[in-house]
C-alpha cells in the first residue's frame, strides 16, 4: 500500500532468461527492479503468475523442494551486505556448498579460492566479515554467488559501493559466468553494467520496457585465473 491505496510494485511481465545471456535491467530506486529480482529468486512470492525454473513453478513447490531448487540452481547477489560474522571470508563463500550438501563438496574450496583471487580478496580469506569494508563485502557476495556454478545468477546492484576498478572486476566475473553458460540478470541504476550486457531493459514505475541486444559491443572478458 502507498498512502492508504493499493498499487502494483511490478506490472504483469513475461520475462525469459536464456543460458549464456547477461541481461541488465536498469531503473531508478523504487522502480520495481529489485522487487522483480526478489520474486525470481524465490524471496518474495508474486501475487499472480509463476516463476519457472527448468519447467517447475518455484512457488507451487513445497517449501523444502523450493529451497532445494533455489540452492541447486540459483546464485543470488542480494542488495546490501549479507554475511555470517562467525565465519571467515572463505567460509562465507563456501556456504552454498555446505547448505546444499551439509558438507563442503570436493573441488569447491579450490574454486572459492580462485574466485577470491579474482575479486582481490585472497589476502583476506581468513578475515571475519566485520573486518571488511562495504565494497569488500560486495565482492565477497559476488564470489559466493558464483562458487557452485549456478545455472542462473541474479545480481541486485552488484557494483554498489565499488570503485571503478572493482566494479569492472565484478562485472567481468558475471560476464564470464554467462559465457560459461549461466543465465545472468543484473539489476542496477548504474551505467557500467550495460557494457557487459547482451540485452538491456529499462524499468520505470513497475513497468518493464524492452531494450536492445548489445553483445556485439560488450568488452571481451579477461582471464580471471
Can you say where each PLM-predicted feature lies in the sequence?
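Helix-to-loop junction immediately C-terminal to a conserved catalytic motif
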Residues: 41
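Conserved ABC ATPase "signature" region
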Residues: 57, 106-123
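ABC ATPase NBD coupling module
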Residues: 58-75
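Conserved catalytic motifs of ABC-family nucleotide-binding domains
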Residues: 149
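Catalytic Walker B motif of ABC-type/P-loop ATPase nucleotide-binding domains
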Residues: 153-156
Amino acid at each position: 500500500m502507498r498512502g492508504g491505496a493499493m498499487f502494483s510494485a511490478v506490472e504483469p511481465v513475461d520475462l525469459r532468461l536464456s543460458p549464456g545471456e547477461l541481461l541488465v535491467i536498469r531503473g531508478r530506486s523504487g522502480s520495481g527492479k529489485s522487487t522483480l529480482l526478489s520474486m525470481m529468486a524465490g524471496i518474495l512470492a508474486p501475487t499472480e503468475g509463476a516463476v519457472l525454473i527448468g519447467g517447475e513453478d518455484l512457488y507451487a513447490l513445497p517449501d523444502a523442494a523450493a529451497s532445494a531448487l533455489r540452492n541447486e540452481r540459483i546464485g543470488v547477489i542480494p542488495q546490501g551486505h549479507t554475511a555470517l560474522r562467525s565465519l571467515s571470508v572463505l567460509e562465507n563463500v563456501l556456504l552454498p556448498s555446505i547448505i546444499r550438501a551439509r558438507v563442503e563438496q570436493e573441488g569447491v574450496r579450490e574454486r572459492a579460492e580462485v574466485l577470491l583471487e579474482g575479486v582481490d580478496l585472497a589476502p583476506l580469506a581468513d578475515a571475519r566479515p566485520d573486518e571488511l569494508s562495504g565494497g569488500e563485502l560486495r565482492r565477497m557476495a559476488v564470489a559466493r554467488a558464483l562458487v557452485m556454478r549456478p545455472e542462473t545468477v541474479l545480481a541486485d546492484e552488484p557494483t554498489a559501493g565499488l570503485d571503478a576498478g572493482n566494479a569492472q572486476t565484478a562485472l567481468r566475473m558475471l560476464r564470464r559466468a554467462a559465457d560459461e553458460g549461466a543465465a545472468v540478470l543484473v539489476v542496477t541504476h548504474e551505467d557500467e553494467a550495460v557494457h557487459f550486457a547482451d540485452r538491456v531493459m529499462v524499468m520505470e514505475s513497475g513497468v518493464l520496457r524492452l531494450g536492445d541486444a548489445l553483445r556485439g559491443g560488450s568488452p571481451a572478458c579477461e582471464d580471471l585465473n
